[in-house]
């Protein structure tokens, strides 16, 4: 007896094949560089999901997972044999019956909470010395808030939460309590801190792109194009 098909409505973003190929290359790069425990499944490993070309499972420790499903050959009766689409959903590990669709901005914000911190160790040192600028390695993760936090604030959080796991050098220790009586480092920080420096609410993209869901769905990224979400 053949199994009956069960159709499920999903929110998807229709994208070009080259966008998917580019995003997959970015994911492979970061998975190898940072040893990310993201899981990649081919279509033959997802036999129960029709039209699914591949799936990426992104763990969110303590809560659930983000499933990124890439579909192909959708709606053949409409002549869409060579079209591709992307679906993003959150799957709870606490309640296995709960799952919900995600838009790219929300997915990027959730990923940003667990991966790809805003700042680097070098940027923290520059902030402690008085340089003020707005920068983030993953600007797509701040779409919901509309503004990237200042690096001084992020550096303070990193210091308090113990994210800097290396020994403090002499110059770094002297910058904990900046003042005019602390030698060259203190005077330099005091001088730079008084300067009028440019501010911006627009974050710059890093040299190596982050695997953003917005980039995958055809939204604003290096290409600068926008595509509306469509249910297929």
Curated annotation (Swiss-Prot):
PTM annotation (Phosphoserine): residues: 150
Principal localisation: host cell
Reported modifications of this chain: Processed in virion by the viral protease. Highly phosphorylated on serine and threonine residues.
Phosphothreonine: modified positions: 100
InterPro entries associated with the record: Vif
One GO cellular component term noted in the UniProt record for this chain: host cell cytoplasm
Topology versus the membrane: Peripheral membrane protein
GO terms (BP aspect): viral life cycle
UniProt motif HCCH motif: location: 112-142
Span list, region Disordered: 164-232
Keywords: Host cell membrane, Host cytoplasm, Host membrane, Host-virus interaction, Membrane, Phosphoprotein, Ubl conjugation, Ubl conjugation pathway, Virion
Pfam family, one: Vif
Additional detail: Vif-defective viruses show catastrophic failure in reverse transcription due to APOBEC-induced mutations that initiate a DNA base repair pathway and compromise the structural integrity of the ssDNA. In the absence of Vif, the virion is morphologically abnormal. The 155 isolate is from a monkey imported from Kenya.
Domain comment, as recorded: The BC-like-box motif mediates the interaction with elongin BC complex. The HCCH motif (H-x(5)-C-x(18)-C-x(5)-H) mediates the interaction with CUL5.
Quaternary structure and partners: Homomultimer; in vitro and presumably in vivo. Interacts with viral Pr55Gag precursor and host APOBEC3G. The interaction between Vif and APOBEC3G is species-specific, which may play a role in restricting the replication of SIV to their host. Forms an E3 ligase complex by interacting with host CUL5 and elongin BC complex (ELOB and ELOC).
Family to which the UniProt record says this protein belongs: Belongs to the primate lentivirus group Vif protein family.
Protein name according to UniProt: Virion infectivity factor
Organism, scientific name: Simian immunodeficiency virus agm.vervet (isolate AGM155)
Organism taxonomic ancestry: Viruses, Riboviria, Pararnavirae, Artverviricota, Revtraviricetes
